[in-house]
């Protein structure tokens, strides 16, 4: 039984795809207990007295969906924060700026030949899954506190099982969905949270311009910046 099922205090799930995206968050935890489920290591504990479960899900939509559902069913979390890096889809954002999700879409999901809109998840009537307004506000405030020199933009997160590395890919996504950043997990987490009635928010620091030029150079720094913002957010919950 997870910590969120053992107490009346609300437990927060925190998901990052890569070790660099969660390392600083995990290091800030007290009273840590680790469980391994589906090859993922779920660290239960506290940050500034707040109950958290922190996990590296691995890259991609399937990993993210499995992880989010496990946090809900196995650990009883009542809200989920997705942290990490992303590629910018807009000239408004540059390296180490931030995105806080208004909603999230799967940019490579397409069953339009059988009558659904591009990106629409059949039988849900939804293309985009909205983030929680209260968590969004707390996330924006946390970014401004933790990284005052960075810009923070609220907007649509576009997720898919591909690394966006060309202007052609970037333009196709923005034309279809109007998103502000691209990554590989957020929309899966958003869909799982929607189906379970769990509030969520995605916080992403920009590591590249959705090209292949800067990701490796700036990924670690951007991941660290985002982790700092998440820590500030958790301490304010």
Where are these regions (language model features)?
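N-terminal short beta-loop-beta anion/metal-coordinating cradle
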Residues: 2-69
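Generic non-transmembrane alpha-helical segments
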Residues: 28, 134-149, 192, 228-236
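Alpha-helix C-terminal capping segments
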Residues: 70-74, 92-93, 190-199
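Proline-aspartate-enriched helix->loop->beta-strand connector
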Residues: 77-81
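Mid-sequence, gly/pro-rich, charge-dense loop/helix-turn segments that line enzyme active sites
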Residues: 89-177
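A C-terminal functional module that forms or caps the active site or interfaces directly
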Residues: 161-202, 207-212
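Regulatory input/activation interfaces that engage signals or partners
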Residues: 198-200, 205-237
């Amino acid at each position: 039984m997870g910590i969120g099922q053992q107490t009346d205090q609300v437990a927060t799930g925190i998901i990052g795809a890569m070790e660099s995206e969660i390392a600083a968050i995990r290091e800030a935890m007290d009273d840590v207990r680790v469980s391994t489920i589906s090859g993922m290591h779920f660290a239960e504990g506290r940050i500034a007295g707040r109950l958290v479960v922190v996990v590296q899900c691995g890259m991609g939509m399937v990993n993210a969906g499995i992880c989010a559902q496990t946090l809900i069913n196995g650990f009883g979390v009542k809200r989920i924060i997705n942290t990490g890096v992303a590629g910018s889809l807009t000239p408004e954002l540059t390296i180490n700026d931030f995105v806080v999700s208004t909603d999230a879409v799967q940019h490579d999901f397409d069953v339009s030949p059988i009558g659904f809109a591009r990106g629409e998840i059949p039988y849900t009537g939804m293309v985009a899954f909205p983030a929680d307004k209260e968590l969004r506000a707390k996330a924006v405030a946390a970014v401004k506190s933790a990284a005052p020199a960075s810009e923070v933009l609220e907007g649509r997160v576009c997720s898919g099982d591909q690394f966006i590395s060309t202007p052609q890919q970037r333009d196709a996504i923005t034309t279809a969905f109007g998103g502000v950043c691209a990554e590989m997990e957020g929309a899966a987490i958003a869909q799982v949270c929607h189906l379970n009635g769990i509030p969520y928010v995605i916080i992403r620091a920009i590591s590249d311009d959705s090209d292949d030029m800067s990701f490796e150079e700036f990924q670690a720094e951007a991941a660290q910046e985002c982790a700092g913002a998440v820590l500030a957010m958790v301490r304010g919950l």
